[in-house]
């Protein structure tokens, strides 16, 4: 069996919340994989994030103008504003950026047998003997991640990962930063208990081969950033009896045909060794 049980979890810790993702695969069929994810990261939108959503000053004013019928002179997404703090004065909600994991799926897996180590046993005596041996070797399990463009999102939350592959005796955990690419590894011994006994005639040789299944699994995690709150609007000469307005950012995005969300993809590749076993064969055997 290629993989008995695999758990992948990640979460970030901030005052607003965090991410949790659990991946559980049993057996070979990808359709049997169960992937659960929860959590979010919420923060008032930063100035450098506006470009990601196409809501820099010009396009935002144009979109607000389509909502009201007249392009405003000033528009804000968060406090402070001119002429006092309109968000506090009128109890308006600043525009916040919410980031959530919206999907995770296995996009590939591979398994192939590989020779981890081998050892020659030869009877150099003049009589038949029984030889007992054990063979083991250290191998490296790895986890590596890559990100698509993070689109300038200012996410300060830390990402805490935990990977567990029971069949491969793999358990890797670490804390990282949003958008950071890195590789983590652990060394484990395979074949420690793989003992064997063989009877050799005088001058006879055998080769003990420690083999294992080298496996890899690729998981794509998709995060989506959306906006909520209202745009604070000012008309210097007033408009329809008022100077100040609050337009919901969703309405502005829809009316102005602006980008409604930003998606970021993280690709995680897990590499491990499992199903180790020893084969004792004639020294000159090809397989």
UniProtKB/Swiss-Prot annotation:
One of its GO terms (molecular function) is toxin activity. Residues 1-17 form the signal peptide. The keyword Signal applies. Keywords: Disulfide bond, Secreted, Signal, Toxin. One of its GO terms (cellular component) is extracellular region. Its main location: secreted. Contains 2 disulfide bonds. It is found in: Secreted. SUPFAM superfamilies: Aerolisin/ETX pore-forming domain. Probable toxin. Belongs to the caterpillar 8 family. This is U-megalopygitoxin(8)-Mc8. It comes from Megalopyge crispata. The lineage of its organism: Eukaryota, Metazoa, Ecdysozoa, Arthropoda, Hexapoda.
